[in-house]
Every structure is written in C-alpha cells, then in structure tokens.
Amino acid sequence: TPALPASSSPPNWVEANHPLGWLINRVLAVEPLRQLLFWQARRLIIRTAEGRGIDWRQRRDLLQAAAEPLLAASTNPSAAVPAYYRARFHAYDQGNLCWAAACEAEQATDSMALRVWPEEPELAPDVAQLRLRRAIFSAIEPSLSGPVRRVLDLGCSVGVGTFALRDWLLERQAAAAFAASLGSPAVAGVEPSPAAPPAPLLVEGLDLSAEMLAVARVREAEAL
C-alpha cells in the first residue's frame, strides 16, 4: 500500500460544514438511526472476522476472563479521564471504558486489516495485519535518522500496534547492527572485534482505559 504524502488531508466531506458531512451528522444525531447504522457496521466487522477464521466471541470471553483479575493493577485512581473517553464509541455506549470495547479491539483491528484487501479472500488475518503495519512503518522510516531507544505509544488500546511497532524496531535495530558489522574494516592478522550489542529498546504503551490496559497485559503475556 503506497504511503500517503505528508501533505495529504482528509476528504472535505468529513467536515461538518460540507453538505455531506452535515447530513451524516444529522443522521447520526437521530438515535434510532444511529443505533441501526452502528449495529449494521458491527455486524459487518464481526462477519468479516468470523468468515476469515477469527472466533470473535470465544476470543472476547477468553480475554475478559484473563483480564478481569488485572483490572486493579491497570487502574490509576488519580488519572483524569477526558470526556471523549467516556463518549459513545462505535457500538459501545460506554466508549473505551468497558470490557466489550477492550475485549473486541483485537478482533476488530484484524477484521479492519482484512477489509483493506477485499480482493484477497484467502488472506490470513495475521498476514493482513503485518502488511498493513509494515506499510505504516515504511512511511515512518524516512523520518528516523538514527537508532530508536525508547518509544511511548500514546493511546495504545490493547497493544496491537504497540507490539507490532516493537517487533519492527527490533528488526530494524538488528539489521543496523548487522550492517555495521559488515562495514568494519579488516586488518591483516587481526580478528575483527565483534559488533557491540545494540542498546536495549524500551517500548511502552499508555492508555486511559484500565480495561484496555488489562487486556494489553494479557496479550503481552501470551506473546512471551
């Protein structure tokens, strides 16, 4: 997928002052219509996921059962949660602050990645996710002038993008170390010194939803 130029801007119809944007906002302001549209969109995402082998409901229940004991450790009582985090989000009336949103985020993200390539019905969810993330990272790469040592992913949700970014940065770090070792000048009769190990990479995720963080902890433990 080609990267968008830095100057790209969203289509003008998303603006509220555009006729289509105004119409969309008006339609969504009618509660029965909003509920119907969100319900249909949710069904579409779930149908895409389950049609490609993602067990949406079983995975949701598994994540919630494993994450509930981690909720207290993922909660910061002093954190000030902004209003938009409590606002209705997609099909979730409680926004990001609910188990349903947190325990379905992984499946929904995979489903959305699959929908980027509708012409490839055999595409596996993990392959679609990897392809999508690598397209994003390829757009980031030119702006990185040197090694990355520490990353904070703001609004990390359940860590799908966070873990993908960590893996990509580790690969980038290893490739740079290998290239540096090949470029070391050889001296006759002297064994080349081994390349210095790369500095540790720290990638952290930050989110104001304790439910999201609890699920992220479960997913991190699964990857170990």
Where are these regions (language model features)?
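N-terminal auxiliary segments of SAM/dcSAM-dependent transferases
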Residues: 10-106
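Glycine-rich, flexible loop segments associated with nucleotide phosphate handling
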Residues: 80-89, 125-130, 194-203
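N-terminal chloroplast transit peptides
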Residues: 1-3
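Short, well-structured alpha-helical patches and their helix-loop capping segments
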Residues: 84, 124, 128, 132, ...
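Mature, folded catalytic cores of secreted/periplasmic enzymes
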Residues: 78-81, 90, 101, 128, ...
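Conserved alpha-helix/loop element of class I SAM-dependent methyltransferases that forms part
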Residues: 108-149, 164, 168, 172
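Class I SAM-dependent methyltransferase SAM/SAH-binding core
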Residues: 150-183, 192-224
